[in-house]
Structure formats: C-alpha cells, structure tokens
Regions:
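Short, conserved catalytic or interaction motifs in soluble domains
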Residues: 68, 93, 120, 163, ...
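Residues at or immediately flanking beta-strands
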Residues: 2, 26, 74, 124-126, ...
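Short, Lys/Arg-enriched segments at the junction into DNA-binding effector domains
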Residues: 2, 113-168, 172, 222-223, ...
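Short glycine- and Lys/Arg-enriched binding-loop motifs that mark or flank ligand-binding interfaces
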Residues: 29, 55, 86, 90, ...
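Positively charged, aromatic-enriched patches within helix-turn-helix-type DNA-binding elements
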Residues: 140-209, 214-216
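Glycine-rich nucleotide-binding loop
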Residues: 35, 215-219
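N-terminal/domain-start alpha-helical segments
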Residues: 1-119, 235
C-alpha cells in the first residue's frame, strides 16, 4: 500500500515515514501542498496523510485542488486543531477522517486501514482471491489454511494485485506503487519478485492465480476465471 505524507514538521514527517515503512507501507513524503501535487502527477496513492497549516500551500487548498479534479484518494487530516469547527471544516473540504495531535501510532494505523477499506469497497481487513487470503491488519497471507511467508516487497506487490483483482497492472504501475518516488533499480526486479510470489502461493496441487499478459503486465484472478488464451502465461 502506497501512502503520501504531507507534513511540514520535519521531525514528525520523518517519524511517520519511518514507522509506516516499518509496518509494511510504501511511503513518499513532502512538506507542502504544492510539492504534493507534483508527486501526485506521477504516482497513484492509496491514502494521504495531510497537515493543515503548511507554507506555500496549506492543507485546505490542497484538498480543494485535488477534489475539484475529481481525485478521490482517501485523505486523513493530521493536525493540532481540535475544535468542532476545525473538524467540520476539514471534513467539508473533502477529508475522509481527522486525527488530532498528539496521537497514538496504533490509532493512525487503524484509521488508515478503515479509510482504505472504504475506498476499495471492503467490509473487513481481509482480501480474498479464490482460496488466497491476505489480512491487512496482521500483514498475513494464507492459502488453503497454510500461512505463506513473504518478504515486505513481495507482500506489497501481492496486496496491490489482490486489491486490483481482474485488472491488469503494468510493471511501471507496480514499481511506482511499491517503491519510493525516486527509486531507480534493476529493470527486471518486478519480474523476479512476481516469480518468487508465484512459487510461494502456488502450493502443491493448487491452481495458479497470477498471470502475465504479454506486453501489458500482470493480473490476479480466481482459478475458475483463468481460462487462458494465447496472450496469457504463468511463468
């Protein structure tokens, strides 16, 4: 899951980034709304953590800008303002939730999970594709009752595929979603990680779930939907 932090307090920004990455999130961070708009031109985020009082462009103006362009990325306002009117103003500006500083990090994690569940139309922390289950809260993957151990990047890629079930994701989309804004790595890294994920989730006597669409990217589907055509492969 890819998050964008927009917070002008450098210490808090760094602490949030560190803790969120430790909990398995991909994170980009910036310090004002104008900079954030530039990030959003090249990366799609699952959720945004947004301060209100910032230089150059504050949180309210940033919210107005993205909502007027019909961007519905979930936004959590993170601010020291705790009056009822401040909360109402923030929510009316287009925020999905509001958390007052200081706060417990566990509450922030829970609110992020709730926001993203709503955005993806989920009613629980579990995502299912056939008999493969991914628990967003526990960062746990199970297939046919057997727990599967994934690296952090393998988990992030699988989560992204499962949240976009039946939709083809390009290698560039996967890279932008899982790695930091300025990442530059091996050109075949996505292919290598997908191959590793397949080896781990395709248990003995189980049918494959992740397919390659030649020239396009990858897609995850229920086994009964995997009537492959000449453009599909699982290698």
């Amino acid at each position: 899951m890819k998050l964008l932090i927009i917070e002008d307090e450098h210490d808090l920004n760094n602490a949030l980034s560190k803790h969120l990455k430790k909990n398995g999130y991909g994170v980009d961070s910036c310090y004002n709304g104008m900079e954030a708009l530039e990030y959003m031109q090249v990366t799609v985020y699952d959720a945004i953590i947004l301060d209100i009082m910032m230089p150059i462009m504050d949180g309210y103006e940033f919210l107005t800008r993205i909502r007027s362009s019909n961007d519905q990325t979930p936004v959590l306002l993170l601010t020291a303002r705790d009056s009822l009117q401040d909360k109402v103003s923030g929510l009316d500006s287009g925020a999905d939730d509001y958390l007052v500083k200081p706060f417990e990090f566990e509450e922030l994690l829970a609110r992020i999970r709730v926001m993203t569940r709503r955005a993806y139309g989920q009613v629980s922390n579990e995502i299912r594709v056939d008999n493969l289950i991914l628990d967003l809260a526990k960062k746990k993957v199970v297939r046919s009752g057997s727990e599967i151990n994934l690296t952090s990047k393998e988990y992030e890629i699988l989560e992204y595929l499962m949240k976009n079930k039946d939709h083809i994701l390009t290698r560039q989309q996967i890279q932008d979603h899982v790695w930091d804004f300025d990442y530059e790595g091996a050109s075949n890294l996505i292919d290598v990680l997908i191959k590793n994920i397949r080896k781990k989730i395709d248990l003995e006597n189980s049918k494959p779930l992740i397919y390659t669409k030649r020239g396009l990217g990858y897609v995850i589907r229920n086994t009964e939907e995997n009537q492959t055509d000449e453009s599909d492969k699982n290698d």
